[in-house]
């Protein structure tokens, strides 16, 4: 058996997230459907670095699967991309040892969130950025960002629907990039809770709008209560950008 690692990019707009759900189109479902065709009807389960929600995109999702087929890496790449729909692309294939695990071996993840600063919607970017029509005080956002960096209990910044009991995570970097008419929030951490990046972005936008004080972030973290943080930003501005492994 070979263990195959794939890096996957997808446009999340027409998926109900990554993970298989009955009666809904998902990324995992499409990948496993393609693998089933290649394995002559045999079901092949894939493991992913993590789930993404409905409408969330990925540039660097990572999956693995085990297979009895002996194909070269380039052959896997070509075969899968031939079988997959246009909104999913395998960008890299690597053969790994059985010690590699797409989920349990993750060392750090990078997410990016795109905000379009415009009162007018952009018809060509509407599915890929969060259009934000209100003026923002960028310096206030920059002042708030360092409070999130480090190891914290992020209960205030995750959905109540999370199934994780341990809400402690470490954020290594948050970078705010001003690029033409967009703000791009770049997050690097050892892991992120359900909706955590989107709630942090929504909170930072509330800071930029003057609804929250930048110096209120430590208090919101300490309260460990979702109701004190800002609104959650929508899914279509979020990208799983890159996943790094310790092996």
UniProtKB/Swiss-Prot annotation:
Record keywords: Isomerase, tRNA processing
Similarity-based family: Belongs to the tRNA pseudouridine synthase TruA family.
GO biological process: tRNA pseudouridine synthesis
NCBIfam families from the UniProt entry: hisT_truA
Record function comment: Formation of pseudouridine at positions 38, 39 and 40 in the anticodon stem and loop of transfer RNAs.
Native organism: Bacillus cereus (strain ATCC 10987 / NRS 248)
Reactions that this protein is recorded to catalyse: uridine(38/39/40) in tRNA = pseudouridine(38/39/40) in tRNA
Record has Membrane as a keyword: no
Cross-referenced InterPro entries: PsdUridine_synth_cat_dom_sf, PsdUridine_synth_TruA, PsdUridine_synth_TruA_a/b_dom, PsdUridine_synth_TruA_C, TruA/RsuA/RluB/E/F_N
A matching Pfam family: PseudoU_synth_1
Protein name: tRNA pseudouridine synthase A 1
EC number: 5.4.99.12
GO molecular function term, any single one: RNA binding
Binding site for substrate: 111
Subunit structure: Homodimer.
Protein origin, superkingdom: Bacteria
Location of the active site: 53 (nucleophile)
């Amino acid at each position: 058996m070979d263990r195959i690692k794939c890096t996957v990019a997808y446009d999340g707009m027409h998926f109900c997230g990554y993970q298989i759900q009955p009666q809904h189109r998902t990324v995992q479902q499409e990948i496993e459907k393609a693998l089933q065709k290649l394995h002559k009807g045999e079901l092949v389960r894939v493991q992913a670095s993590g789930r993404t929600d409905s409408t969330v995109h990925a540039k660097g999702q990572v999956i693995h699967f085990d297979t009895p087929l002996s194909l070269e890496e380039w052959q896997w790449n070509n075969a899968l991309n031939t079988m997959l729909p246009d909104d999913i692309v395998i960008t890299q294939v690597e053969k790994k040892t059985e010690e590699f695990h797409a989920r349990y071996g993750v060392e750090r993840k990078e997410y990016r969130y795109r905000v379009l600063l415009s009162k007018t919607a952009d018809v060509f970017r509407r599915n890929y950025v969060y259009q934000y029509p209100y003026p923002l005080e960028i310096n206030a956002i920059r002042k708030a960002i360092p409070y999130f960096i480090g190891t914290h209990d992020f209960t205030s910044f995750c959905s109540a629907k999370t199934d994780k009991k341990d809400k402690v995570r470490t954020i290594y970097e948050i970078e705010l990039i001003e690029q033409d008419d967009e703000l791009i929030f770049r997050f690097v951490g050892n892991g992120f809770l359900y909706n955590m990046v989107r709630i942090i972005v929504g909170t930072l936008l509330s800071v930029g709008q003057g609804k929250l004080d930048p110096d209120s972030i430590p208090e919101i973290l300490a309260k460990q209560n979702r109701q004190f943080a800002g609104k959650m930003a929508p899914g279509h501005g979020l990208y799983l950008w890159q996943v790094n492994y310790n092996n």
